[in-house]
Amino acid sequence: TLEQYHKCSWVISCDAAAYERYNRIKNILCLKLIDSDDCDHNMATEAQKDNWMKVMMTKFDAVNKFMNLYGRCLFLDSDMIFVNPIEDEILNILTNKNIDACICQHMTNNWPVEAKHGLYNGGMFHVRNKNFMSQWIDLSKNYKKYGFYFEQQPLEYVQRNFNSFNLPINYNIGWWRFNTPATQSRLNALKIVDDKIYFGNRPAVNFHVHTLREIGYQNFGQFLVDKICDLMKTTNNENYKKVLDFLF
């Protein structure tokens, strides 16, 4: 969906099935690094959690490969839906050589949860400093030793050593920003303006939906998927129609 708004080149870490499907596409370089997707980070066995971490570590391989090719990298989890282009002011920040990384806070307003799972979400970030990545990888490899939540929690410690920028709330919009009594009212800020989804007074850029594969338990974010799909159905936006056709 990002390609509806921006010209993109991709490096993806994937399994054999995805490799066969995507490696023939001109602007995608596939790294066949994933052996199994029998993994999870929530309600899972220890073996599944270990497999989850193996998958998570492959994203660092993809990021480093992309940085070697292009000098910087915007990383995205595969379950992102872009509904507006990245704003020009943010594009200017991404190209600023004085900023080492751009990262996304969870913004749950639920401090005990963030103390456990991390202040930042690891599903979207931009990086240009290889030392940033090296430190993140080193801490992630030792996540059990330090009691970190997989590769995600180390991010909040690494960013302290660099010039980092927090992307605003209209980026990487996940269900966790709406799921407490104190934050549920944020759903009312999602609305249609000029046939586009807005989050308050800013265009909603992308949603992190957790919906592209079966997960074996209740998808706690289904309410957000339903919300954005219902909003898209009320518009005449051709890009949204393509997203809905893909999902349904």
Please report, for each region that a protein language model flagged, where it lies by residue:
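Amphipathic alpha-helical segments that form well-ordered structural scaffolds
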Residues: T1, Y5, A62, E151-V158
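N-terminal anchoring/stem segment of glycosyltransferases
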Residues: T1-T45, N68-Y70, L224, D230, ...
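Short, well-ordered alpha-helix to beta-strand connector turns
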Residues: H6, Y70, I99, F162, ...
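Charged, often glycine-rich, active-site loop that binds/positions anionic groups
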Residues: N27-S36, E46-D50, R177-L190
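GT-A fold catalytic core of metal-dependent nucleotide-sugar glycosyltransferases
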Residues: V55-N110, V127
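Extracellular/periplasmic catalytic domains that process cell-envelope and extracellular macromolecules
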Residues: T95, H117-L119, I197-R202
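A recurrent flexible, glycine/aromatic-enriched loop bordering the glycosyltransferase active site
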Residues: W111-M124, G147
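Catalytic core and acceptor-binding pocket of nucleotide-sugar-dependent glycosyltransferases
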Residues: M124-F223, F246
